[in-house]
Curated annotation (Swiss-Prot):
Lineage, broadest ranks: Bacteria, Pseudomonadati, Pseudomonadota, Alphaproteobacteria, Hyphomicrobiales
Coiled-coil annotated residue ranges, if any: none
Binding site for orotate: T137
Pfam families: Pribosyltran (PF00156)
Name this polypeptide is given: Orotate phosphoribosyltransferase
Amino acid sequence: MNHFTFTDRTVVAELVAKMLWEIKAVHFNSESPYTFASGMKSPVYIDMRKLISFPRIRSAAMDFAAAAVMREAGFEKFDCVAGGETAGIPFAAFLAERLGLPMIYCRKKPKGHGRNAQIEGHMPDGARVLVIEDLTTAGGSMFTFIDAIRAAGGIVDHGIALFYYGIFEEAEARFANGNVKLHYLTTWRDVLAVARAEKLFDEKTLSGVEAFLDNPLPWSAKHGGVSELPQS
């Protein structure tokens, strides 16, 4: 296992936000909002998958993730790391390597042939599993994987997202009700703070983004999107 520096969480949040701006993973556009699969309209979009193509930034982010898990959850709390199909799979491999743990991955649905498996890899019954995703919006996709792992006999008390939206009360309730502690590196508020400090956009654009972060669903509805999040 690697040796990690347990950097202060606020410093990590700022550094990771800067990394995301550097690799152009973040997009702001208040004039032509993005439409998500949920039907929500948003002036912000982030592509966390880009991290896998930038080895130095990827390595630093995964070191931060490993340190966050050990600092906030403990050193001997897990038996394996699970990645969610598909974006979480490479990050599960990177994190498992750093934590010295086995890795599994979880499909969104059973594959429908062969063993009809939804969990790939070896997961002993009662294994304590850390679930990782590249990003979490309101927790719905992560709980798809958590529920499948629990149904297969695994124990899931913790999840980690490299990026957490951090703007939906529904997400806080979902994780609390699901008895899962969510760990994360950075949020939209951190990304916006870096953009403002480094003057990456004019104040009109930044204020438009901030208006969305303050009231995301009303903003979405006003711009032709959904006014509530899907329940699943």
